[in-house]
């Protein structure tokens, strides 16, 4: 069931006031799906919808009675505080509210982001005690992150803002930073592909954490991954704060163990399966098999490039050259950057442009299909014909391995067997 269908269904089945997410732009949100999953895990359900409001609508909405409880996101985590009759200890200390519940006629502001972010760090093994931390952004989410880091014993917490003493023009001077946390919306769907700064400029950086969960891995995290750092996306934080909020909404304790299963299920549903490897290795055939077995959309970048240009690949190479083809290919790759839950088969040379990596990795699990070179066909494959296959393989192997999240050798496998292996890896 799609998110919007889930919302409509829940509202129809529950005539009582809904819970929901309050924000300005909510196209990126997974929250309705998350709360549906929490309800299902508890053997119940509760209506949860999105409330997109402009700043001038905030007062009348919060003073109205059209909702039972709220989660609050950018840019209203601080703006809602004057409308709350009381704040929890965490919300009061942090100065930001992400959950509002009703107590009779009173509105009580809470901060469940604190629990969510703390759980995210714990579950991913991010050792904060004694570490120098750099926090990007100075809004409500930043205040929560700063509080958690200090409570966990960080040696230093430095905030980077647009106009502060430490800003984006001089942040790279913070060379003692060991943990970087992005709390800005830069890189969030639909503006994928952006990053507030380059993490590779910090020589001591060990961890890059982003509270953004859509895309699953922001451009910032992809850059950090390429630079050899450990990375953590924001999906686990979303789920942790959502469970804490649901406890407040429903007035009952919820086992934290359900979070791991919800995260695994959401990741499996949202993450693309991206196949890379040599020309002729079987990416299209195996990809189609995976898509059929999992009921997913299938995208073949070579086929899409041919359709877009109107000429077959050998003709494009012969008439325009490889550089022209790579530009066409990159255009198709970038058009798929916001796609989720699909299977994508890439051309063999997609790894020759680093920009393609970031577009594919933000929402994708990249799997390198490897096969004995003697079994690779070369007909209709211009590069395989122009360059000796063994040489081409030696040139590209380091790229395939630096890009991939997993490698599977499929020599001797039938497509259905290879597809089963890949599905089992997820």
Regions found by a protein language model. Give the residues of each.
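ATP-dependent small-molecule kinase phosphotransfer cores
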Residues: 303-361
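Adenosine-phosphate binding glycine-rich loop
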Residues: 212-271
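Glycine-rich adenosine-cofactor-binding loop
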Residues: 23, 111-114, 121-122, 126, ...
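Phosphate/diphosphate ligand-binding glycine-rich loop within oxidoreductases
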Residues: 13-124, 215-217, 221, 227-230, ...
């Amino acid at each position: 069931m799609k998110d919007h269908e889930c919302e409509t269904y829940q509202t129809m089945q529950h005539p009582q006031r809904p819970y929901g997410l309050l924000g300005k732009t909510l196209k990126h949100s997974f929250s309705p799906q998350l709360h549906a999953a929490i309800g299902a895990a508890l053997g119940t359900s509760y209506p949860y919808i999105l409330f997109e409001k402009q700043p001038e609508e905030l007062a009348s909405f919060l003073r109205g009675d059209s909702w039972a409880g709220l989660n609050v996101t950018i840019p209203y985590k601080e703006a809602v505080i004057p409308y709350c009759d009381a704040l929890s200890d965490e919300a009061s200390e942090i100065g930001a509210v992400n959950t509002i519940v009703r107590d009779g006629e009173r509105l009580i502001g809470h901060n469940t982001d604190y629990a969510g972010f703390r759980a995210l760090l714990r579950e991913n093994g991010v050792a904060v005690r004694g570490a120098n931390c750099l926090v990007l952004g100075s809004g409500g989410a930043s205040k929560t992150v700063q509080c958690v880091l200090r409570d966990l014993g960080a040696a230093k917490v430095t905030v980077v803002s647009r106009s502060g003493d430490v800003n984006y023009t001089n942040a790279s001077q913070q060379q003692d930073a060991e943990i970087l946390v992005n709390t800005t919306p830069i890189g969030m769907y639909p503006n994928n592909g952006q990053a507030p700064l380059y993490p590779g400029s910090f020589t001591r950086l060990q961890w890059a954490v982003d509270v953004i969960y859509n895309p699953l891995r922001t451009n910032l995290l992809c850059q950090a991954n390429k630079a050899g750092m450990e990375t953590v996306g924001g999906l686990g934080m979303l789920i942790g704060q959502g469970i804490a909020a649901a406890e407040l909404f429903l007035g009952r304790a919820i086992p934290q163990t359900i979070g791991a299963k919800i995260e695994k299920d959401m990741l499996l549903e949202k993450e693309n399966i991206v196949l890379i490897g040599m020309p002729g290795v079987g990416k299209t055939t195996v990809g189609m098999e995976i898509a059929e077995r999992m009921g997913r959309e299938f995208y073949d970048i070579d086929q899409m490039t041919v359709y877009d240009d109107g000429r077959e690949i050998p003709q494009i190479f012969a008439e325009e050259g490889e550089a022209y083809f790579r530009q066409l290919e990159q255009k198709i790759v970038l058009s798929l950057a916001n796609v989720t839950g699909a299977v994508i088969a890439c051309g063999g040379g997609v790894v020759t442009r680093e920009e393609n990596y970031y577009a594919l990795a933000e929402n994708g699990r990249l799997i390198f299909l490897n096969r004995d070179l003697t079994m690779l066909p070369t007909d209709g494959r211009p590069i395989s014909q122009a360059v000796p296959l063994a040489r081409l393989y030696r040139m590209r192997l380091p790229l395939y391995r630096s890009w991939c999240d997993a490698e599977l050798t499929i020599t001797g496998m039938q497509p259905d067997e290879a597809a089963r292996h890949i599905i089992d890896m997820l």
